[in-house]
């Protein structure tokens, strides 16, 4: 691949980078080099993801090379001064080496995005770069990765998580138990980048748990992909053992990062949750009293006592009483209280900083107990205990010494909880009563008149970012296609930012047509504000506008509404008036559904309709699935209509409190937005995201029509993406509808005449079309002549890998594309896929689809090879199968103690430390280094501390040789005890 020198770092890029891509990569490298943070905006379609991955991994690779040279230099320097040496000299030199090496660690990259489909897109981008052989792993949830049939039958993520924990704890999950012995299998450690689906397939083939196997890959990975919540939620970081020290954190698609940070620090609890928790505790107590617990859980000792349950029930009863005593002045909108009220509320039930850890531990144990019990009787599985655990964890997450900041950033909002079965006191008593009714304070005193919902809301996203920075990360890079304006974003997140960028678009001015349409064909004003949205004349004029545009725009037309109610209102009116039928005559209409299953089928039908000469219309809402994630490149989206500004609900309590928070904390120094500016920006960012569904690559073209007269206001224009503002000019005005129709028709006529048609591959399958890259310019990819039947073969091979949910991911990268980007000249036919894979690295053949055949062999040969690999290891071998035979032997080797003992630890200190670092986690290596330095000048107690760490880290059979190798570095008086303790393993 072409190499470019960017900011002093050689970067391999699939093609010669455009100026906007070079500018972007320079900013990234400056951040990594200097250990600073960056906020970088680059429009969708400019190659942002590709630039981000190539620049960051190029810098990592350069650092790895420098690190290796330093280690060799240090090793030579250390041994040049060694002679005989006094006893203990080895220990002193090892400690000295350890101290230096600890500061030399090469940073690793954590790439986080909002959804797994976005992560899959990034991983597919990585596959087509020169950095595809760098070690990578993706972290997913149990819901996505678990393959245990019993666990997968559970409903809801929480139940699956708890059932998984139970089976792991009780050692009844064979998939998890095989991970340790098979975690080094070539299929798992091979050079191929594996996304979620690949991990599941490997797990099923090896009969190991993909969830825990992926965690084993993290310590050695150069780049780890994960969703936001794994990174920003302290609970998730702890549960997944994610270490952030000296890491580079990349937050892609970060336009919603403020909301995500706020939501990760917010929590909700209901009166009904507390009542059900009391019910569940009482049930467990009755089981204990009756002796049934032995039958339910066998002879295993309980992790809690009846006294623990009694104390917990008393606390929950007091909490219920305290919640019942809250006075809600406004039954409709609720009542707001200061943050201190939450601590006072929990304090009345004796939940404090001093005991919260113990209570959370007890709640987690009760969840495990109920999961076992639920297998034998019809009871709840402890979901309310999980809710209470989350409440206590989040409320008490901040240390007591920062409470003044907590009080300024949080609010408590109490709402009336509606009864699911009816209204009134009697119905409420029925809902919370049952066999438990006589045991609750509510029933005994009649205090509980109205059930309530307690919201603990965070309005300061800086909390989440501050916790992230406190983990000693090297750099944090926030990036998206729609971050502007940058200053208020940086101010709200409260992070020091050294590098910032607002990139222009990669396309030419002639490829985009942007207009503000202030009136419809009937000269009715188009404005979707509160006063006008019910106006029948406005709704009719908007429909006429869409009809006229649909007559002109070829292929796909996207129409975004501010909300689902507004979408439904327009649809009903147009169906009644006949406008719906008129539009449908021009193009079939598809509506964005809310359910996942319907969404998938609707998208498939839309892409199928695009292949028709008439195209199709897709009507969706801003902030919906379509506006946030999907790629409508080329024919899929030739124009987008924005029907209005999607402002948040003005009277929503959370919106009101957010605006108040900004007004109360805004100063000239911190540059926070005013409440009204934030309100406007929230709407405009959603518009920017919707606009980003079209113009997805260098040779794409399309029209953007803003059908709301408010878009001409300076306050709205300034919040649009920079590249869109460039098309509107300094003083944008609403254009008359007639001239717009003529200009729009001429625009598409010119574009179709002058622009290159999309690659024919994009029209082969509607699902393949959506998976096309947004980054690679089509000019860099020559057309590939397809052999008869090749499309059917391709579709069959990739059918399970391409899904509508991942429609924003890139099109599968083919051998022809790789050869083109790498500078190879292709002949008339596309290269054989297996021959292509063999060229990636001739020395690597660790996964079955890396097996190569002669380029003359057809697809039938490929099928036969796969069948031989899986069912007949003794089948005759060709030259290309020798590697696979060696691979099968590796797979069948069992992990035995003798195999690890036969291996010896490196004699040289630097080599010893290098190998140790590669075998343990960063945290384990840090603990080892600290204990070793203390042992050097310490006492017998320091030896015991060192031994504890050594046995914890190096006692496993596969690494025990390193434990044995530590003997030479110990003091003579401790070697006998070391031998005895190691011998007992």
From Swiss-Prot:
<dbReference type="InterPro" id="IPR006554">
    <property type="entry name" value="Helicase-like_DEXD_c2"/>
</dbReference>
<dbReference type="InterPro" id="IPR049909">
    <property type="entry name" value="HHD_RTEL1"/>
</dbReference>
<keyword id="KW-0597">Phosphoprotein</keyword>
<feature type="region of interest" description="Disordered">
    <location>
        <begin position="863"/>
        <end position="883"/>
    </location>
</feature>
<comment type="similarity">
    <text>Belongs to the helicase family. RAD3/XPD subfamily.</text>
</comment>
<dbReference type="GO" id="GO:0006974">
    <property type="term" value="P:DNA damage response"/>
</dbReference>
<protein>
    <recommendedName>
        <fullName>Regulator of telomere elongation helicase 1 homolog</fullName>
        <ecNumber>5.6.2.-</ecNumber>
    </recommendedName>
</protein>
<dbReference type="GO" id="GO:0003682">
    <property type="term" value="F:chromatin binding"/>
</dbReference>
<keyword id="KW-0158">Chromosome</keyword>
<dbReference type="GO" id="GO:0046872">
    <property type="term" value="F:metal ion binding"/>
</dbReference>
<keyword id="KW-0004">4Fe-4S</keyword>
<keyword id="KW-0238">DNA-binding</keyword>
<dbReference type="GO" id="GO:0051539">
    <property type="term" value="F:4 iron, 4 sulfur cluster binding"/>
</dbReference>
<dbReference type="GO" id="GO:0006281">
    <property type="term" value="P:DNA repair"/>
</dbReference>
<dbReference type="InterPro" id="IPR013020">
    <property type="entry name" value="Rad3/Chl1-like"/>
</dbReference>
<feature type="compositionally biased region" description="Polar residues">
    <location>
        <begin position="872"/>
        <end position="882"/>
    </location>
</feature>
<dbReference type="GO" id="GO:0006260">
    <property type="term" value="P:DNA replication"/>
</dbReference>
<keyword id="KW-0547">Nucleotide-binding</keyword>
<feature type="binding site">
    <location>
        <position position="173"/>
    </location>
    <ligand>
        <name>[4Fe-4S] cluster</name>
    </ligand>
</feature>
<dbReference type="InterPro" id="IPR006555">
    <property type="entry name" value="ATP-dep_Helicase_C"/>
</dbReference>
<keyword id="KW-0067">ATP-binding</keyword>
<dbReference type="GO" id="GO:0005694">
    <property type="term" value="C:chromosome"/>
</dbReference>
<keyword id="KW-0347">Helicase</keyword>
<feature type="binding site">
    <location>
        <position position="164"/>
    </location>
    <ligand>
        <name>[4Fe-4S] cluster</name>
    </ligand>
</feature>
<comment type="function">
    <text>A probable ATP-dependent DNA helicase implicated in DNA repair and the maintenance of genomic stability. Acts as an anti-recombinase to counteract toxic recombination and limit crossover during meiosis. Regulates meiotic recombination and crossover homeostasis by physically dissociating strand invasion events and thereby promotes noncrossover repair by meiotic synthesis dependent strand annealing (SDSA) as well as disassembly of D loop recombination intermediates.</text>
</comment>
<dbReference type="GO" id="GO:0003677">
    <property type="term" value="F:DNA binding"/>
</dbReference>
<keyword id="KW-0378">Hydrolase</keyword>
<keyword id="KW-0479">Metal-binding</keyword>
<dbReference type="InterPro" id="IPR045028">
    <property type="entry name" value="DinG/Rad3-like"/>
</dbReference>
<dbReference type="GO" id="GO:0005634">
    <property type="term" value="C:nucleus"/>
</dbReference>
<feature type="binding site">
    <location>
        <begin position="42"/>
        <end position="49"/>
    </location>
    <ligand>
        <name>ATP</name>
    </ligand>
</feature>
<keyword id="KW-0413">Isomerase</keyword>
<feature type="binding site">
    <location>
        <position position="146"/>
    </location>
    <ligand>
        <name>[4Fe-4S] cluster</name>
    </ligand>
</feature>
<dbReference type="Pfam" id="PF06733">
    <property type="entry name" value="DEAD_2"/>
</dbReference>
<dbReference type="InterPro" id="IPR030845">
    <property type="entry name" value="RTEL1"/>
</dbReference>
<dbReference type="GO" id="GO:0045910">
    <property type="term" value="P:negative regulation of DNA recombination"/>
</dbReference>
<dbReference type="GO" id="GO:0016887">
    <property type="term" value="F:ATP hydrolysis activity"/>
</dbReference>
<keyword id="KW-0408">Iron</keyword>
<dbReference type="GO" id="GO:0010569">
    <property type="term" value="P:regulation of double-strand break repair via homologous recombination"/>
</dbReference>
<dbReference type="InterPro" id="IPR014013">
    <property type="entry name" value="Helic_SF1/SF2_ATP-bd_DinG/Rad3"/>
</dbReference>
<feature type="modified residue" description="Phosphothreonine">
    <location>
        <position position="874"/>
    </location>
</feature>
<dbReference type="GO" id="GO:0003678">
    <property type="term" value="F:DNA helicase activity"/>
</dbReference>
């Amino acid at each position: 691949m072409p190499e470019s020198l960017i900011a002093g770092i050689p970067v391999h890029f699939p093609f010669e980078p455009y100026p906007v891509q070079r500018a972007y990569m320079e900013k990234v490298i400056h951040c990594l080099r200097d250990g600073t943070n960056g906020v970088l905006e680059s429009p969708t379609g400019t190659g942002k993801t590709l630039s981000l991955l190539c620049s960051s991994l190029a810098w990592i690779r350069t650092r790895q090379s420098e690190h290796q040279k330093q280690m060799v230099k240090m090793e030579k320097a250390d041994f040049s001064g060694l002679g005989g040496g006094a006893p203990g000299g080895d220990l002193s030199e090892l400690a000295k080496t350890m101290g230096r090496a600890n500061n030399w660690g090469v940073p690793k990259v954590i790439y986080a995005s909002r959804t797994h489909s976005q992560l899959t897109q990034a991983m597919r981008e990585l596959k087509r770069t020169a950095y595809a052989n760098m070690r990578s792993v993706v972290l997913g949830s149990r819901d996505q990765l678990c393959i245990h049939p019993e666990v997968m039958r559970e409903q809801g993520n929480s139940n699956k998580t708890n059932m998984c924990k139970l089976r792991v704890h009780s050692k009844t999950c064979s998939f998890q138990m095989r991970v340790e012995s098979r975690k080094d299998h070539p299929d798992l450690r091979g050079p191929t980048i594996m996304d979620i689906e690949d991990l599941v397939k490997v797990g099923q083939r090896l009969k190991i748990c993909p969830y825990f196997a992926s965690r084993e890959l993290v310590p050695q990975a150069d780049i780890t992909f994960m969703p936001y919540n794994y990174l920003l939620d302290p609970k998730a970081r702890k549960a997944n053992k994610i270490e952030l020290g000296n890491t580079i954190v990349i937050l892609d698609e970060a336009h919603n990062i403020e909301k995500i940070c706020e939501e990760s620090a917010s929590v909700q609890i209901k009166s009904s949750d507390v009542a059900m928790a009391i019910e569940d505790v009482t049930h467990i107590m009755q089981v204990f009293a009756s002796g049934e617990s032995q039958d339910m859980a066998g002879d295993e000792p309980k992790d809690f006592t009846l006294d623990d349950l009694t104390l917990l029930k008393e606390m929950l009863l007091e909490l219920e009483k305290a919640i019942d005593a809250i006075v809600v002045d406004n039954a409709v909108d609720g009542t707001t209280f200061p943050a201190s009220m939450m601590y006072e509320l929990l304090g009345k039930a004796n939940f404090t900083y001093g005991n919260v850890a113990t209570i959370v531990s007890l709640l987690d144990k009760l969840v495990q107990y109920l999961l076992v019990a639920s297998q034998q009787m019809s009871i709840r599985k402890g979901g309310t205990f999980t809710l209470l655990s989350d409440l206590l964890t989040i409320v008490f997450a901040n240390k007591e010494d920062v409470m003044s900041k907590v009080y300024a950033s949080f609010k408590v909002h109490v709402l009336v909880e509606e009864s699911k079965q009816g209204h009134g006191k009697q119905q409420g008593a029925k809902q919370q009563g049952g066999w438990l009714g006589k045991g609750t304070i509510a029933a005994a005193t009649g205090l509980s008149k109205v059930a309530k919902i307690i919201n603990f809301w965070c309005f300061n996203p800086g909390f989440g970012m501050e916790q992230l920075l406190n983990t000693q990360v090297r750099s944090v890079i926030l990036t998206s296609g729609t971050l502007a304006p940058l200053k208020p974003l940086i101010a709200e997140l409260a992070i020091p930012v050294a590098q910032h960028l607002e990139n222009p678009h990669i396309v030419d001015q002639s490829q985009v047509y942007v207009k503000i349409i202030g009136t419809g064909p009937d000269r009715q004003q188009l404005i979707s504000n509160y006063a006008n949205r019910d106006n029948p004349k406005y709704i009719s004029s908007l429909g006429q506008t869409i009809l006229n545009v649909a007559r002109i725009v070829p292929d796909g037309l996207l129409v975004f509404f501010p909300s689902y109610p507004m979408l439904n209102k327009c649809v009903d009116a147009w169906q009644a008036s006949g406008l719906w039928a008129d539009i449908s005559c021009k193009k079939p209409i598809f509506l964005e559904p809310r359910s996942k299953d319907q969404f998938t089928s609707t998208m498939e039908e839309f892409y199928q309709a695009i292949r028709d000469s008439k195209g199709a219309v897709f009507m969706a809402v801003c902030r919906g699935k379509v506006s946030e994630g999907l790629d409508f490149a080329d024919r899929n989206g030739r124009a987008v209509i924005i029907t209005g500004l999607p402002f948040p609900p003005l009277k929503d309590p959370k919106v009101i409190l957010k605006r108040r928070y900004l007004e109360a904390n805004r100063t000239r120094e911190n540059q926070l937005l005013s409440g009204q500016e934030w309100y406007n920006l929230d709407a405009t960012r959603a518009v920017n995201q919707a606009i980003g569904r079209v113009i997805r690559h260098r040779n794409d073209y399309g029209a953007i029509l803003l059908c709301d007269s408010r878009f001409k206001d300076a306050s709205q224009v300034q919040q649009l993406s920079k590249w869109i503002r460039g098309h509107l000019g300094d003083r944008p005005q609403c254009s008359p509808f007639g001239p717009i129709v003529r200009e729009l028709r001429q625009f598409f006529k010119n574009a179709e005449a002058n622009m290159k048609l999309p690659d024919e591959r994009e029209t082969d399958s509607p699902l393949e079309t959506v998976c096309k890259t947004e980054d690679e310019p089509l000019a860099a990819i020559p057309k590939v002549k397809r052999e008869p039947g090749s499309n059917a073969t391709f579709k069959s091979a990739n059918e399970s890998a391409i899904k509508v949910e991942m429609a924003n991911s890139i099109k599968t990268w083919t051998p022809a594309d790789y050869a083109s980007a790498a500078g190879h000249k292709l002949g008339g036919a596309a290269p054989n896929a297996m021959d292509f894979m063999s060229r990636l690295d001739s020395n690597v053949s660790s996964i079955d689809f890396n097996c190569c055949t002669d380029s003359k062999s057809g697809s039938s040969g490929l099928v036969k090879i796969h069948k031989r690999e899986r069912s007949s290891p003794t089948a005759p071998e060709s030259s290309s199968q020798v590697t696979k035979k060696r691979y099968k032997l590796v797979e069948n080797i069992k992990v035995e103690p003798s195999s690890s003992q036969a291996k010896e630890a490196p004699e040289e200190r630097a080599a010893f430390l290098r190998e140790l670092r590669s075998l343990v986690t960063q945290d384990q290596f840090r603990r080892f280094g600290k204990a070793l330095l203390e042992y050097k000048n310490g006492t017998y107690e320091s030896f015991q501390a060192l031994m504890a760490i050594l046995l914890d880290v190096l006692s496993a059979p596969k690494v025990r040789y390193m434990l044995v190798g530590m003997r030479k570095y110990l003091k003579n008086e401790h070697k006998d005890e070391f031998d005895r303790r190691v011998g007992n393993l």
